[in-house]
């Protein structure tokens, strides 16, 4: 089951179901078919595990399920952030923006690592842009926030993702069951390493950072389709009327951004 764990005593419910399959019990889905754990292992030529003393507890009394979900979400978030830098750079070209806001000196004056990296990425992407070069001597002093502040917004998300990566890395290499056995001193110590709070806060942070990437992206889309702001044909289509161009695409983006705000509400404060 995807639900049933509050994380305060490890992921007992989902991990129990996963672990049952590992020993040939329970149920699993293979190639779209639901079957017994024993048949699922046989279908993949895997022998059931024979657990030794203490291994059953280690399998279920930890944060492995949260780690797995966090890893998948972080992987997608990092990929999303790379594409966000590319999309912002393309928007800068389309809206006849300037690269001056990405000058390294600006970002060294406020040296957040993510901000510096985002600005560097956007400079690199646009360095040979003939479109931007064609109007570099125009009278415009500065661009709209959605373009000019892209490194600051994207960079904050980059830094958030780096923090989440560190938390997940520590958790992946940690021992989270209880009780812990220390052979060198021949001691059994009870503790609370199974508690999921470090991961919960990190994953909430991850969700907020992703939502912010979407917010500024949607605002750039709105600027692109709005002729009063972009100087381009309305909804990026020459002949309006029957053809509404990218109007609905912007509507969809706005709807997704609103949905993200609810999804990004911190779950850790209500658990």
What are these regions (language model features)?
Residues 1-6, 48, 188-197, 236-243:
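A short glycine/serine-rich beta->alpha loop
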Residues 2-22, 58-67, 72, 76-89, ...:
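Conserved phosphate/anionic-ligand binding catalytic regions in large, soluble enzymes, centered on
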Residues 8-23, 142-166, 241-254:
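Long, acidic, intrinsically disordered low-complexity segments
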Residues 14-123, 127, 263-271:
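Mobile "lid/hinge" segments at catalytic clefts and subdomain interfaces of large enzymes
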Residues 42-51, 183-190, 230-238:
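Glycine/charged-rich beta-loop-alpha catalytic/anionic-binding loops adjacent to active sites
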Residues 56-62, 177-185, 224-228:
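Active-site-adjacent bridging/hinge elements
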Residues 92-215, 231:
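Accessory "access/gating" subregions that flank catalytic or transport cores
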Residues 197-271:
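C-terminal catalytic subdomain
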